[in-house]
Amino acid sequence: MHTQVLFEHPLNEKMRTWLRIEFLIQQLSVNLPLADHADALHFFRNIGDLLDVFERGEVRTELLKELERQQRKLQAWVEVPGVDQSRIEALRQQLKTAGSILISAPRIGQQLREDRLIALVRQRLSIPGGCCSFDLPTLHIWLHLPQEQRDAQVETWIASLNPLNQALTLILDLIRNSSPFRKQTSLNGFYQDNGDDADLLRLQLALDSQLYPQISGHKSRFAIRFMPLDSENGLVPERLDFELACC
């Protein structure tokens, strides 16, 4: 059982979007293979949410900019004595490859957007109980196809996101590993500090404290208020130790 709980909080809109995309892509695989109605609806709901996120901004443009920014950051490390040059070069090549694949890929989500079954289910998801067999006979018969046939179709849908997912995973790994965790202490449940142009806050709390952080702020400055899970009887200690990374 985990003794620490990790919280992540974006400090700008692009990071907020990326974390949502990462979460939704991870959710696509949770209930595979799609063996029943509940598993299928979970899958299609996450597909629909992903398409909604894609339609709100220039996801590919922001990722390509970030891939270039990370390459420049790695270039600055080349001249630092003692740095593992082979590791730096390997990461730069990964960034270049991810960028080339992403820029040559079709519009993000286009294959999913044009799929008839996904479109039909997506239309009905906003209606309470709108995915019954009489509302969606297409989904009903699809769920009665051989498992292997459904698995192959699901695999094709997920694979269409690979160019995006590979670039996003690489970027988030680099950002998350850009700063170590450091011990901090809050006073009376409150902590604030400068963001130093960070994109992401990562905070670790002891599980047995049964506290969670409410974080506000941006890349220049942020504030953290610790709240008890039990809002009526829970207590926040006068001094609370936690670990924080500004990435």
Swiss-Prot record:
Q: Which GO terms describe its biological process?
A: division septum assembly; FtsZ-dependent cytokinesis
One Pfam family in the UniProt entry? ZapD
Q: Name one GO cellular component term.
A: cytoplasm
Q: InterPro entries from the xrefs? A: ZapD, ZapD_C, ZapD_sf
Disulfide linkages recorded for this protein, renumbered to the chain, are none
Q: Which UniProt keywords apply?
A: Cell cycle, Cell division, Cytoplasm, Septation
Localized where? Cytoplasm
User: Quick one: where is this thing mainly located?
Assistant: cytoplasm
Q: Where is the signal peptide?
A: none
Subunit annotation: Interacts with FtsZ.
Please give the PANTHER family that the UniProt record associates with this protein: CELL DIVISION PROTEIN ZAPD
What does the sequence similarity comment in the record state about its family? Belongs to the ZapD family.
Tell me, what does this protein do in biology? Answer: Cell division factor that enhances FtsZ-ring assembly. Directly interacts with FtsZ and promotes bundling of FtsZ protofilaments, with a reduction in FtsZ GTPase activity.
- Listed name of the protein: Cell division protein ZapD
Q: Which organism is it from?
A: Citrobacter koseri (strain ATCC BAA-895 / CDC 4225-83 / SGSC4696)
